[in-house]
């Protein structure tokens, strides 16, 4: 994993591929002002899109895996952690978390769109090894913001893989998560010493500054996706609430 932001020319990223040669599995309306979320399939490959823009492709999940791995590394030595994941996606973040946390862990997944949960129990399940079947997992079909606003000192780690990061595409209310108020809610929902890990499709210097202003000890990490020597980079922020 590198903080280097350079990138070499190579084949187009998966989100540049046209959806025309993919088969429609299902489209659903995101609650509130979120528009239409579409699940597409081409052979064993799946794509989640909104407004014609790809949010996730099953061929590329290095940064989703890294989100869980980096958060877990910060909690080394803590047994039976309680973890909150905002956003289920295709289950890769959840699956990576289950691999890194012990048998006594409890992992709460907040997913606003109930059909995304159904897709993960159906056609998307095999992609990440059916993580929803793990007995450590509790699914709450609700906005993760409601959980953050209602709980204090509840979690050892909070992983936000919601929308497209601070520059959201799916649901306008997601923007609140990345404001000072949203970050303060996450800060207070963590145990002292707890970790907030945030996924984004791109860097955002102002967001890093907001994390630090809230009181987090925060760093920005760039994760290369696709081939090891070329491709795009996603951005992760790993932030710790001081003990």
Where are these regions (language model features)?
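Class I SAM-dependent methyltransferase Rossmann-like catalytic core
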Residues: 28-32, 36, 48-80
């Amino acid at each position: 994993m590198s903080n280097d932001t350079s990138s070499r020319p190579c084949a187009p990223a998966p989100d540049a591929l046209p959806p025309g040669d993919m088969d429609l599995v299902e489209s659903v309306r995101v609650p509130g002002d979120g528009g239409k979320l579409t699940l597409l399939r081409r052979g064993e490959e799946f794509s989640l899109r909104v407004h014609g823009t790809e949010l996730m492709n099953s061929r590329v999940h290095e940064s989703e895996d890294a989100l869980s791995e980096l958060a877990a590394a910060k909690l080394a030595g803590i047994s039976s952690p309680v973890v909150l994941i905002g956003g289920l996606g295709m289950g890769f973040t959840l699956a990576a978390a289950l691999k890194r946390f012990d048998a006594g862990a409890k992992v709460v997944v907040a997913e606003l769109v109930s059909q995304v949960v159904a897709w993960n129990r159906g056609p998307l399940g095999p992609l990440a090894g059916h993580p929803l079947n793990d007995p450590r997992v509790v699914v709450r079909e609700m906005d993760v913001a409601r959980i953050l606003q209602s709980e204090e000192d509840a979690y050892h780690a909070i992983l936000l893989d919601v929308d497209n990061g601070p520059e959201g595409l799916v649901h306008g209310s997601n923007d609140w998560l990345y404001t000072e108020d949203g970050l303060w809610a996450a800060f207070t929902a963590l145990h002292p010493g707890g970790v907030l890990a945030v996924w984004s499709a791109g860097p955002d210097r102002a967001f890093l500054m907001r994390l630090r202003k809230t009181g987090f000890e925060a760093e920005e990490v760039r994760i290369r996706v696709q081939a090891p020597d070329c491709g795009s980079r996603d951005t992760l922020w790993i932030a710790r609430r001081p003990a």
